[in-house]
Every structure is written in C-alpha cells, then in structure tokens.
Amino acid sequence: MLFTRQAQRDARKLASASPALKAKAEHLLALLHSDPFQRPPSYEALVGDLKGAYSRRINIQHRLVYQVLDEEQIVKVLRLWRHYA
C-alpha cells in the first residue's frame, strides 16, 4: 500500500479530528490491503479528473479515495479527508 503526500497529511488530520474517524479509516485500509474490491462496504468508481480511482465512505463528509495499480499490485491511497476536494 502506497500513500501520497496528501494522503499522509489527510491521515494526520483525520487522527487528530476524531478517534472514531481514525478507527473507521484504519478498518477500510485493512480491507483495501486484503482486497480493494471487497463488498461490503460498497465503493464507487470515480469519473472526471479522478477517473480510474475508487472511493469508499469514511463518514458523510470524508472519503477514502484510492487507485489500484494492477501491474505493481499496489493500492495507492490518494485522499482521506473531505469529499473529493
């Protein structure tokens, strides 16, 4: 699993904002590590600038946005804070 710099900053914000948000994000990251396409919880394929990326809901306001790099067999976490900001 690979985190962009923005995702690393987002993770720090998330951890300081709420223990519940941090726990939910950690749970989702563990699911992504084992199978990025596992359902439930549901995920959404994104379009536009984020085409090729997927989103999972952390809560109403925040999303975990990630890409699956098939050739490298890596999940790249793009964002963890806000809604596609």
Model-predicted segments: where are they?
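Enriched for short, Lys/Arg-rich terminal
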Residues: 9-26, 47, 56-63, 67-85
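Short hydrophobic/aromatic-rich motifs at helix boundaries and adjacent loops
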Residues: 1-2, 14-15, 34-37
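A short, surface-exposed loop/turn module that caps and links secondary-structure elements
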Residues: 30-57
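Alpha-helix N-cap and coil->helix boundary residues
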Residues: 2, 20-24, 41
